[in-house]
């Protein structure tokens, strides 16, 4: 009705947003542009799969400030440069990981010292930093873990939520360490992983000390082993037929865990 329409616009700032955390963002935006909460109205537009991108406010505060200054409806459309530079990015991690194993390759311990560069803002940086300690070494039964993770703030791009929150950063460190350890011990990297994956018979746990919901990795490695061996044979045959002129492009087989 007419009265309701007037109430919606009278001395009240209205912002349309595709936020996936609209009640979380409202106080952040209100505080940022100096508008009391009772004078700010947020309308959630339909949004598709954001993969975490809109777990952070992006252009809402800019729109709000522009509307207050212009005292009229405003619209903002980013060009490609602005879309790249004015939105949050996956925070880079700097991980230092050490692994210990017995003479057979069975993992005994993990030590880690990690940093998350979260850019200039603290928004959810603590949660992301926790992920480095939760996920580094995940997938393997490691009886002793000492892993310290810290957040640092810089003038780099501000950190936002991204798909597989913290997992790529964590697994980059521990999976490279697994490869290095396997190479030093002369153990096939596939077999090193199969030997140390979660096993219900051994009561192995995730890095936080809890058992996984499902013990499935052992069966997956058994299923993948013949495919892996066939792949190794195929790659060896192709490389053997090479004249060596393109050695840096030599074929190899890759292992991917597929974990998130």
Q: For the regions a protein language model found, what residue spans apply to each?
A:
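Structural alpha/beta core scaffold segments of enzyme domains
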Residues: 3-6, 10-260
